[in-house]
């Protein structure tokens, strides 16, 4: 909800916001300014006897304003954007805010109603556009020669990588500084087309124009605005309906007809949703709101200040992944280098005189043998953030398990050995034994491996093969460590390889999910890859796919900063057999430290 202020008071607040800090991860609202008064400004703006009176359009007079703050009259315009992909539209929004780059701002997310996980939003969004009326009554801006940071802000910059202090700085001062504010109103229709839509860009543009003309030109249809939607169709209906975007982590229904949507939003003016456009226009002068701002990064004014590099890195991480500000401390604690164990340099690349392990699996009479690396993988007292099955060796015929872990232990964590640290999974319950191919050949034990202690996390893993009758059975063993001085934040979650339905046999189905009707999954778009590593997908593999790859799913099961709130750790795992492939399903948990005399009555049920 915006600040509902009369024109004169809104002008005072707008002028008072110049030089204040702002958190760009959130929407543009005057009430979100850090402080929002002269005394809380981050910039040293000259105030004194030479202050002047500013007269704004509409006869509004604001006394005692610094001469460094200038006022300019605005304009009214209708603007229709091009049909643009996600990142280009995000870049266009940033340019309007005097920002560089393609990372979505809070304004962009609010207008198109995206989540903070922009990589997933970008993967499932085909095109974006908007058409609207923008009324700028006036703008107030700071003279560029007066951009000088106050000394107390420089002194507040942490000199080392201190996640708690960095999170506190961002919470108090924000990420950027306001140097310009445009006041007025806007009435805009935003179009969002999902990846599965077959509609061509020119057709989407045409339909958007038709809907916008009905709203702005004819003004003959009463529209609901705010957070309500107008669902698009071939007949350009104005029926309100929420778009359900495909979510890879959900098994919810997917409607192919809901492949694009129009959203009507207003800023400024009367907030009566039943007002027609022409009626709303008459109220903007009396109740203006901020429609745009310009910013400069706080870090651009910290040259030579000790610790400015750490702050810049923390702000970049925060704006890229947008964790909840109240959880930024824990998020930053986890932004350590991640690596796989064993490291690639330890994998044998040359010819081997004999297999390192005699353990092997065979899935049919004529099929090749899949050798199993039974060497334990232990990362010590460091949290694991991901797992994968991998085919090692020159012939890619040796199955191994790899663990992704943080390079060091976050300072907020303490790990101690679990009393039951080595969990040996050798269930004799044959309901968990599932064939990969032929019934009389190798099986996989799909029983979940997890600790009885909710505060335990995985710190080691091992594959193990045992003979049961005439067939070998593959088992997964895990090692656990206990998190000291922490509490479980929410219920643990299970993830599995994308594209595999969670039904690995009757018993596995019963313990994993309730029976549900078969749902048509959405088409899987290409992921937005922001990893600049030389080999972001793992070590080089042969140009020809290994023969045994048809029996093993080598997808990486990881959770990083892009999975909000960004500090998940592995607390369990299980093997699955899906469509004739051995795969992994991983359990993740969130822990937060118990600070001081804090008493946790019960874990949050999320």
Swiss-Prot record:
Pfam families: MACPF
PROSITE patterns: MACPF_2
InterPro entries: CAD1/NSL1-like (IPR044663), MACPF (IPR020864)
Record-annotated MACPF domain positions: 1-332
Annotated GO CC locations: plasma membrane
Keyword set, alphabetical order: Hypersensitive response, Immunity, Innate immunity, Plant defense
Purpose of the protein: Negatively controls the salicylic acid (SA)-mediated pathway of programmed cell death in plant immunity.
Assigned protein family: Belongs to the complement C6/C7/C8/C9 (TC 1.C.39) family.
Protein name, entry field: MACPF domain-containing protein At4g24290
